[in-house]
A protein has these predicted regions:
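C-terminal non-catalytic interaction modules
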Residues: 1-12, 16, 286-353
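N-terminal leader/linker segments that initiate helical-solenoid repeat arrays
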Residues: 1-34, 55
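Residue signature of alpha-solenoid helical repeat architecture, marking inter-repeat boundaries
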Residues: 4, 55, 96, 133, ...
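Residue register of alpha-helical TPR repeats
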Residues: 8, 52-55, 59, 96-100, ...
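Short coil/turn connectors between adjacent alpha-helices in alpha-solenoid helical repeat scaffolds
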Residues: 15-28, 65-77, 106-118, 144-159, ...
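Amphipathic alpha-helical segments of tetratricopeptide repeats
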Residues: 31-45, 81-90, 123-131, 162-174, ...
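Solenoidal tandem-repeat scaffolds enriched in leucines and small polar residues
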Residues: 127-202, 206-208, 213-214, 219
Length: 353
């Protein structure tokens, strides 16, 4: 076998391990490949001398970015993207594999809370591809970016983007992308049409269950729980009976066995949800630790806010002041002036308590 053929066998093996959610072995094999290819020292990394084709190298770096994006390992995703850009000729930057890598970059921007960067990147990509798979992902991400809970006039635009995404996904018969888009449509609709939004999330869960995708089933369940919480907060002071939503949220959280979750990412999302539903600070701190380690500053800010609120309710002002420092750091990392201003005001309020 040639060096190229051996590399493709190893790439496919990593992909299979990732599909099986065996991330420990996938990461170990990737670490071996990375060192074997000499990517830690680009001055000594010669493709032709070692018998590798450029195309195979680019496939490896693309897959590596996706592998670590699925684990929220932002530094390794960005390292893979940087190496891809280093090796990729200018005429391939906007080919299919180049577009896919750029979508990964936009996903990283979203997770870091850099929404303006993500939008700019995605709208640029929208003009550069006709691939239905890429169009489905781009439109879905753009629909997700306009946060309907903060910007109600953006809902119509969100649905237009997501409807296009659903059309592309159905055209490809990509069940995973279809379920993901239903999930996002549900999250958009729930603020104005709660019953319809929840039905879309249920539909996403049903599709994922039929497809045997345990990760996506979990995502739908936790999304349902977050919607229940939002509805309880929205109608808390309006005399509406929220017991149905409260029961559903608790039932979902308690039905999930954390020990059976297959990856650290799944456990972190579960911990966040459990912490919010059951007022469990220990779970919230577990989630906070994971997302801080992986530089997911949007998540860090939201979870720290929840911990701070619990501490305020307990009049534990020392914890409030400590956790506001975490909020401030996350807001600065996101370069979000609105959040920075809000945290500084809160710090001033609790300074002498």
């Amino acid at each position: 076998m040639s060096s190229d053929e051996i590399l493709m066998v190893l790439i496919n093996q990593v992909e299979k391990l990732q599909q099986d959610k065996d991330f420990d072995k996938a990461n170990q094999l990737d670490d071996f490949i990375y060192k074997w290819l000499g990517l830690s020292d680009l001055k000594r990394c010669s493709l032709q001398e070692r018998g590798f084709s450029l195309d195979t190298y680019l496939v490896y770096l693309h897959n590596r970015a996706c592998l670590y994006l699925n684990q929220l390992d932002i530094p390794k995703v960005l390292n893979s993207v940087r190496l891809f850009r280093y090796f990729c000729p200018s005429n391939m930057i906007y080919g299919d594999i180049g577009i896919s890598v750029a979508i990964c970059e936009a996903d990283v921007d979203m997770r870091l809370g850099k929404t303006d960067n993500a939008k700019s990147r995605l709208y640029d990509l929208l003009e550069r591809t006709q691939n239905p798979y890429h169009l489905a992902r781009i439109n879905r991400m753009l629909g997700e970016l306009e946060n309907p809970y903060l910007q109600f006039d953006g809902i119509k635009g969100n649905l237009e983007q997501l409807s296009q995404a659903l059309g592309y996904a159905e055209k490809m018969r990509d069940k995973r992308e279809i379920a993901e888009t239903y999930l996002n449509i549900g999250n958009v609709l729930v603020s104005s049409h709660p019953a319809l939004g929840l039905s879309m999330i249920w539909q996403a869960q049903i599709i994922a269950e039929r497809n045997g995708d345990s990760h996506q089933v979990l995502s739908a369940k936790l999304s349902r729980t977050c919607v229940d919480i939002r509805l309880m907060l929205k109608y808390a002071n309006r005399g509406v009976d929220m017991s149905v939503f409260e029961k559903d949220a608790k039932d979902v959280v308690l039905s999930i066995d954390r020990c059976k979750l297959q990856s650290d990412v799944e456990k972190a999302f579960y911990d966040e949800c459990r912490g919010m539903v059951l007022d469990d600070d220990e779970s919230l701190y577990e989630a906070l630790g994971f997302f801080r380690t992986h530089h997911a500053y949007g998540k860090v800010f939201n979870i720290a806010q929840n911990i701070a609120w619990h501490a305020v309710c307990k009049k534990d002002f020392l914890t409030v002041r400590k956790i506001l420092d975490v909020c401030y750091d996350a807001a600065v990392k996101m370069n979000d002036s609105v959040k920075i201003k809000a945290v500084l005001q809160a710090m001033k309020q609790f300074k002498d308590l």
